[in-house]
Amino acid sequence: MRLLLWVLLVTLVTFLSSGDAAPVDSNKQLERAAINKVTSRNLANDNSLKHEKRFLRGDRSNIVNLKDGDENEERKIGQKMTTALKSIKVWYLKWEQKILLPGFKKMAKKEMTYSKLMDRFRVRMMNSGRWGTPSGFKRYGRLYKDYLISINRADLTV
């Protein structure tokens, strides 16, 4: 059931982020003619009317007559969603650093090396039934290693 929910969510995000709508006035109107046998034959031969090349929605390099406000009229749900998710991610990473830094400082004072930290995680997980170190522990170790490099304690990253 969770897999189905994830598939639906990923499908929704994919559709919302991949579609852009073109402004209404990006395509020039074709000249309209009365429909009769003569004009329909001429349309088929492309002789009588001046047909200008129509722009496809994705071909924005050829679009002329765009005003400054036309870009805002497009539906940008996917872009809004992406920026909202990015801002949530930035907020979470700042919050996480605020929580983790005091522990990193204590471990650096005790001169705990990166390899000792990872060994401690392995010993903790020994009787848990898992075969390896979970990704959360690996990420914690990687963040600790980055912290040690940032405070110029590269000797502890071994």
From Swiss-Prot:
A motif (RxLR-dEER) lies at residues 54-75. Pfam families: RXLR. InterPro entries: RXLR. It comes from the Eukaryota. GO terms for cellular component: extracellular region; host cell. Induction: Expression is induced in presence of citrus root extracts or during the interaction with the susceptible host. Its main location: secreted. It is found in: Secreted; Host cell. Residues 1-21 form the signal peptide. Keywords: Secreted, Signal, Virulence. Secreted effector that completely suppresses elicitor-induced cell death in host and enhances virulence of P.parasitica. Belongs to the RxLR effector family. The RxLR-dEER motif acts to carry the protein into the host cell cytoplasm through binding to cell surface phosphatidylinositol-3-phosphate. This is Secreted RxLR effector protein 2. It comes from Phytophthora nicotianae. The gene is RxLR2.
